[in-house]
From Swiss-Prot:
Enzyme Commission number: 1.8.7.2
Keywords: 4Fe-4S, Disulfide bond, Electron transport, Iron, Iron-sulfur, Metal-binding, Oxidoreductase, Redox-active center, Transport
Protein name, UniProt field: Ferredoxin-thioredoxin reductase, catalytic chain
Disulfide bond residue pairs: 58-88
Phylogenetic placement of the source organism: Bacteria, Bacillati, Cyanobacteriota, Cyanophyceae, Synechococcales
Cofactor(s) this protein cannot do without: [4Fe-4S] cluster
The species this protein was found in: Synechocystis sp. (strain ATCC 27184 / PCC 6803 / Kazusa)
Membership in a protein family: Belongs to the ferredoxin thioredoxin reductase beta subunit family.
PANTHER family: FERREDOXIN-THIOREDOXIN REDUCTASE CATALYTIC CHAIN, CHLOROPLASTIC
Gene Ontology molecular function, alphabetical: 4 iron, 4 sulfur cluster binding; electron transfer activity; ferredoxin-thioredoxin reductase activity; metal ion binding; oxidoreductase activity, acting on iron-sulfur proteins as donors
Biological process annotations from GO: photosynthesis
Function: Catalytic subunit of the ferredoxin-thioredoxin reductase (FTR), which catalyzes the two-electron reduction of thioredoxins by the electrons provided by reduced ferredoxin.
Taxonomic superkingdom: Bacteria
């Protein structure tokens, strides 16, 4: 394992911890298909490493660096903080048809999805 891999795993673990704690704090849940959750957390970790901030990975940006500075789409984004609306389906309210009952995700699930994306 290279030092880059170690850093990637630390960032992925940090984003996992953030997502789990935020879901519990806001009474939201992960998608019933945890692979959706894993892809979003992996995207947040990648943006955290590349841009220094967990920019929403589910949107298209003309200028990611400008978006990071703007902070509107940094996770948790403004729509999530204000209205519990998560475009990525990472944080779902209990009444959402796609909401599961999990507020935790196994690290193995994240690693499997990350490996399948490589």
């Amino acid at each position: 394992m290279t030092s880059s891999d170690t850093q990637n795993n630390k960032t992925l673990a940090a984003m996992k911890n953030f997502a789990e704690q935020y879901a519990k704090r806001t009474d939201t849940y992960f998608c019933s298909d945890l692979s959706v959750t894993a892809v979003v957390i992996e995207g947040l970790a990648r943006h955290k490493e590349e841009l220094g901030s967990p920019l929403c990975p589910c949107r298209h940006y003309e200028d990611k660096e400008a978006e990071v500075k703007n902070t509107f789409w940094n996770c948790p984004c403004v729509p999530m903080r204000e209205r519990k609306e998560c475009h990525c389906m990472l944080f779902l309210t209990p009444d959402n048809d796609f909401a599961g009952d999990a507020q935790d995700i196994p690290m193995e699930t994240l690693e499997e999805v990350k490996a399948s994306m490589a």
